[in-house]
Amino acid sequence: MRPYYIAIVGSGPSAFFAAASLLKAADTTEDLDMAVDMLEMLPTPWGLVRSGVAPDHPKIKSISKQFEKTAEDPRFRFFGNVVVGEHVQPGELSERYDAVIYAVGAQSDRMLNIPGEDLPGSIAAVDFVGWYNAHPHFEQVSPDLSGARAVVIGNGNVALDVARILLTDPDVLARTDIADHALESLRPRGIQEVVIVGRRGPLQAAFTTLELRELADLDGVDVVIDPAELDGITDEDAAAVGKVCKQNIKVLRGYADREPRPGHRRMVFRFLTSPIEIKGKRKVERIVLGRNELVSDGSGRVAAKDTGEREELPAQLVVRSVGYRGVPTPGLPFDDQSGTIPNVGGRINGSPNEYVVGWIKRGPTGVIGTNKKDAQDTVDTLIKNLGNAKEGAECKSFPEDHADQVADWLAARQPKLVTSAHWQVIDAFERAAGEPHGRPRVKLASLAELLRIGLG
């Protein structure tokens, strides 16, 4: 019996979790064999683990060791630098595989939709994070970090990452895998204050406690919260929201009780505040902030309502971190409102053999580990459908050398195709470059350099 040929488009956590689930199912199920091909638009795998997780969070990045173990399986192949929708089309993949899983994530950002948002100095967190993580698509972002104050819009972990990177001592960052160009820009330490702005209150903030607590470890940085921001919030209020919220409020109160120290840089939290307008002649110079109040919608949820109160704050950099958003893949359905591919249980609506996992399936929610169960759920649906196809004599017929034919086809469509062997060359090069400096790796930040090293 031939193996089932499965393609996975994307190579982030949800993609690798799906691959691991497929291979495990083959190991534990009689008469079930799998051959998994992973297609990635970049020459490098791991998705946001490589290009999204902050460089000063190496423990989170260590999950890549699990991915490496999956990639070592002889039933697994990696093909990088191939763009689905450009080099190959979804319909062509569906013809050549028994099933195709799309794990393409949420590659865009949500806009603020306010005047001045397009001024130089106003950028999306997805761009800024990609820039300091050496994602080749964001090499040219080059934000101006010479100003004294930055404003980060958003109350999630990504907003904390951005603020922390802006204020962390560059000598500390120099021991991480941060992009060299980002380290060079951060070295002058021009930014003295980062203001984190959230439209709702502390009870509604989406930070995780670990991320919030570690801010206390920033050398030479004060975390500043006006005690009035926490007035009226009881332990019972926080506990009613959840355990994480209760812990967060405790941490925030600790920061609010501290006295700022002279000469320290500042990370300032502002709640119940929304951006109204970004001002400047040729670049960001000021931001207009509006004060909000919380109102109930009658169903137990609260929303931020503008009070009409305004404040103008000098700022030279504005980073919007109000959420990621999926983008359409040519040839696949797309729900523009949610930024996801419509599906039922992971199976794409109207398709017999196409599936989704991760953020493109459910939206940009949860942490890396959330994708594990999400991927397993989709794989369970996929395997069940494969069994139904087999029983109904709908199983595809492929020649014995089908895997070789697919590899040749991909190489013909993309002559600069990156294989697992090529990626291993890139990986070894980056690690070797970092070793003399006590860094885990020095990332290659341009597509041209990645291909030059990988392909030789």
Swiss-Prot record:
Its EC number is 1.18.1.2. NADP(+) binds at residues 110, 155-158, 199-200, 211, 366. It is an enzyme of class 1 (oxidoreductase). It catalyses: 2 reduced [2Fe-2S]-[ferredoxin] + NADP(+) + H(+) = 2 oxidized [2Fe-2S]-[ferredoxin] + NADPH. Transmembrane segments: none annotated. Its cofactor is FAD. One of its GO terms (molecular function) is NADP+ binding. Keywords: FAD, Flavoprotein, NADP, Oxidoreductase. The keyword Flavoprotein applies. Pfam families: Pyr_redox_2. SUPFAM superfamilies: Nucleotide-binding domain. FAD binds at residues 14, 40, 48, 84, 359, 366-368. GO terms for cellular component: peptidoglycan-based cell wall. Belongs to the ferredoxin--NADP reductase type 1 family. Transports electrons between ferredoxin and NADPH. May supply electrons to P450 systems. The enzyme can use both NADPH and NADH as a reductant, but the catalytic efficiency is two orders of magnitude higher with NADPH. Monomer. This is NADPH-ferredoxin reductase FprA. It comes from Mycobacterium tuberculosis (strain ATCC 25618 / H37Rv). The gene is fprA.
